[in-house]
């Protein structure tokens, strides 16, 4: 739960669906949408405000979620057309997920409003009604509008409704409007729209072909000896260790690591296996486990171990034998000068 300035709201945490999240991420990347992936990222009112009104949440939530955050305030931002295409790609991702799940796509963001400058307080209920009608019946027309046109009709912050096109892109051309409401209490138009798909299930070979498409870029890499692509699955497994080692950039953290490592392992919630890999300085084992090299070299800098020594250990060679394979006999690390 994000603290947005006045302490977090009194709501329970919500669980995610990690496997579906990874599948969606990999599918969107395969469809050429450049995604960033997060752990430990608090959610704000964009999720909790609408969902706490829709679902019971006294002690827990009855759903698992996959948050998809799209920046629409700091320019440059995606176009309306790009958002719609993202929705279409999201549909392919969900339909190709091998497990049979019920999935609802929730779009958030206020309709007409502006909350900055001399134009703050601007609303346009007529545009809001037109937008909702177009979203249901002719979403392609909405993809032709520029950000300036959205801002003119609905306020600068009201342009965030382009994210609703992501939701609409996941649905079939024809949808059933189950519910619609509109409310303008103060600064922001609040609309609720419930749509139901009218599509048919795809033949199984279509979804299988998409899953193969998702694997295309790495096809064959599994045959490379001693090579471990840093996939989302490996990242998830090694997350605690990678987070622990990344904190070596903090002077106090690395000092505590050198003086009281066991206490630090416990504080970070490392498993016994993870702690033992660090105790033994098992460079190869750390890579096998799911640690990315670029935090291993931070550990090496703290311990006074060069990158070349780590490379040699990963290859199972002495540093002398490894150096014979290099053009220059030089050792280096990411360590800087110690402060005076």
Curated annotation (Swiss-Prot):
Induction comment: By gallate.
GO annotation (BP), single: gallate catabolic process
Keywords, alphabetical: Aromatic hydrocarbons catabolism, Dioxygenase, Oxidoreductase
Catalytic activity: 3,4,5-trihydroxybenzoate + O2 = (1E)-4-oxobut-1-ene-1,2,4-tricarboxylate + 2 H(+)
Catalytic EC class: oxidoreductase
Keyword Repeat: no
InterPro entries in UniProt: Gallate_dioxygenase_C, LigA_sf, Xdiol_dOase_LigA, Xdiol_dOase_suB
pH-activity dependence text: Optimum pH is 7.0.
Pfam family, one: LigB
EC number: 1.13.11.57
UniProt keyword annotation of Oxidoreductase present: yes
Active-site residues, as the UniProt record annotates them: 45, 113
Cofactor(s) listed in the protein's UniProt record: Fe(2+)
Gene Ontology molecular function, alphabetical: ferrous iron binding; gallate dioxygenase activity
Function: Ring-cleavage dioxygenase that acts specifically on gallate to produce the keto-tautomer of 4-oxalomesaconate. Mediates the first step of gallate degradation pathway.
Family stated for the protein in its record: Belongs to the LigB/MhpB extradiol dioxygenase family.
NCBIfam families reported in the protein's UniProt record: PRK13367.1
Record-given protein name: Gallate dioxygenase
Species in which this protein is naturally found: Pseudomonas putida (strain ATCC 47054 / DSM 6125 / CFBP 8728 / NCIMB 11950 / KT2440)
